[in-house]
């Protein structure tokens, strides 16, 4: 139930003679506002302090400044990759969804902003009617048929004494800022997904080179074995063993070609053009350059990650929603006015005698709402707690993400050093085994063993090179992909 206290329209001179009306409205509003019961409804969640996750205390100050360009993929030195990312940023549907959400949030902000301003509308009413002879209508109107007309402007302005509409506007602005950060996060994620898929394709193509080289070596070895069998130096066992390696190598090539096509299809979907799979040149893994990235977790990580910025702005918006829910307990104070022309008989509508106008305040206060206002406040407070915990989870996930990428980057560097030494030994052993077999000093089992070892190392070299690049892309994304928040809300929970 809503109780409203309305004041009759009167003239400007009458209002001037009774300034006590305005004072009475404000006093009544203050007294009635004191009856608002919001006890026991407070936010429970708290924002995690950056120092509690080690961002300030352990990170070196040397990496506090942004080190990743907003177009970080250019540092990889691949023109085809640059073109793919540019096409994806222009055509990808997921990115357009994020941009549409931003446009919607901006429209909501305009609606909230309009609520702070006076509202004016016009009305035109033209009616032809017969007046009853058995009602309260006096003669000569009773029983007659007349035309009535009204031309009127109505104005109203709700005075935002308790900040209801300001809180709604601030909440909408927070949502806009969150949507802007979401759009940037989508951009960073899309670019990293394109780069990672491109590296995956380069890895597959490099593995194809290894597989084809292996097939050629096995064909060469099979020719040698057949010559030795013809000369009576080896048996059919060695020949069958050598022949068995060819189908296995061809099967591996076919599997890698399938993987290559699937990756090309994925790239086509990411860039929004399936035809890309048909015209894309095979990327060379060795031609993709390494990037210069932070060696540790940046101290200002919270300002670099668009997803964290979006989560923080959602906390701010939820806090303002709580403020708005609290203002629902307070009175609404409106100033209303109208002016226009009204007459019975259209021939007299336009004239000074038909002029009517009025102005006055109106006070409305919720007295009994069946618990609706408290339930609404509890819901908005729960939304705030959820937004805070979502932000805290985003912070922890971000720190975990960067820490994993940094640890992997360091480990892969050490692994590559060891793998290169292992491959050098395996290549030498394979060459010696083949030479000894040709000279009749070794058996075919030694050749098979050496070939297996060198094949493992060649594949491992490709995998580590691809993984090193993939981790670099992951690290570029994890530290924000070049995003820097212009400003974040103060580190507190709004709405308290």
Language model features with spans:
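A short glycine-centered flexible hinge/capping loop motif at secondary-structure junctions
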Residues: 229-233, 437-441, 478-480
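Terminal intrinsically disordered/low-complexity segments used for targeting and assembly
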Residues: 2-7, 19-90, 149, 173, ...
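Small/polar, glycine/serine/threonine/aspartate-rich low-complexity segments that form flexible
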Residues: 67-76, 126-154, 277-294, 323, ...
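Periplasmic alpha-helical coiled-coil/stalk elements that build and connect Gram-negative outer-membrane
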Residues: 165, 181-297, 408, 412, ...
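Short flexible linkers and secondary-structure junctions
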Residues: 36-193, 333-337, 367-377
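Transmembrane beta-barrel architecture of outer-membrane proteins
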Residues: 81-83, 148-150, 196, 241, ...
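Sec/SRP-type N-terminal targeting helices
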Residues: 96-97, 113, 159-187, 237, ...
């Amino acid at each position: 139930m809503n109780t409203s206290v309305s004041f009759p329209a009167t003239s400007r001179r009458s209002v001037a003679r009774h300034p006590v009306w305005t004072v009475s409205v404000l006093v009544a509003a203050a007294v009635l506002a004191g009856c608002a019961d919001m006890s026991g409804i407070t936010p429970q969640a708290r924002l995690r302090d950056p120092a509690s996750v080690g961002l300030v205390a352990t990170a070196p100050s040397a990496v506090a400044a942004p080190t990743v360009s907003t177009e970080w993929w250019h540092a990889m030195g691949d023109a085809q990759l640059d073109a793919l990312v540019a096409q994806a940023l222009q055509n990808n549907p997921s990115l357009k969804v994020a941009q549409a959400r931003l446009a919607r949030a901006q429209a909501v902000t305009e609606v909230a902003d309009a609520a702070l301003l006076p509202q004016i509308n016009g009305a035109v009413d033209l009616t032809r009617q017969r007046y009853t002879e058995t009602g309260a209508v006096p003669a000569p109107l009773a029983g007659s048929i007349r035309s009535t007309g009204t031309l009127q402007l109505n104005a109203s302005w709700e005075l935002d004494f308790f900040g209801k509409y300001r809180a709604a506007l601030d909440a909408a602005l927070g949502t806009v800022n969150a949507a802007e950060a979401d759009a940037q996060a989508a951009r960073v994620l899309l670019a990293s997904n394109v780069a990672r898929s491109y590296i995956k394709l380069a890895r597959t193509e490099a593995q194809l080179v290894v597989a084809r080289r292996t097939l050629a070596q096995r064909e060469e070895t099979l020719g040698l074995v057949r010559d030795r069998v013809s000369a009576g130096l080896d048996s059919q066992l060695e020949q069958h063993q050598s022949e068995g390696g060819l189908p296995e190598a061809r099967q591996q090539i076919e599997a890698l070609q399938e993987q290559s096509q699937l990756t090309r299809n994925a790239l086509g979907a990411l860039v929004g053009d399936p035809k890309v799979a048909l015209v894309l040149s095979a990327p060379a893994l060795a031609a993709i350059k390494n990037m210069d990235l932070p060696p540790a977790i940046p101290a200002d990580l919270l300002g670099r990650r668009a997803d964290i910025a979006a989560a923080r702005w959602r906390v701010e918006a939820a806090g303002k929603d709580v403020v708005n829910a609290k203002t629902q307990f307070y009175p609404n104070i409106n100033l209303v006015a109208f002016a226009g022309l009204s007459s019975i008989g259209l021939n007299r509508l336009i004239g000074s005698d038909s002029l009517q106008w009025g102005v006055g305040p109106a006070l409305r206060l919720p007295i009994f709402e069946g618990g609706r206002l408290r339930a609404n406040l509890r819901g908005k407070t729960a939304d705030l707690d959820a937004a805070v915990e979502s932000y805290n989870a985003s912070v922890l996930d971000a720190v975990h993400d960067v820490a994993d990428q940094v640890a992997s980057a360091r480990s892969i560097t050490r692994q590559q050093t060891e793998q290169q030494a292992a491959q050098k030994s395996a290549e030498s052993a394979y060459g010696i085994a083949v030479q000894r077999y040709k000279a009749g000093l070794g058996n075919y089992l030694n050749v098979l063993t050496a070939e297996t070892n060198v094949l493992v190392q060649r594949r491992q070299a490709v995998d580590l090179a691809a993984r090193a690049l993939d981790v670099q892309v992951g690290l570029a994304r994890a530290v924000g992909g070049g995003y820097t928040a212009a400003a974040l809300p103060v580190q507190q929970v709004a709405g308290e």
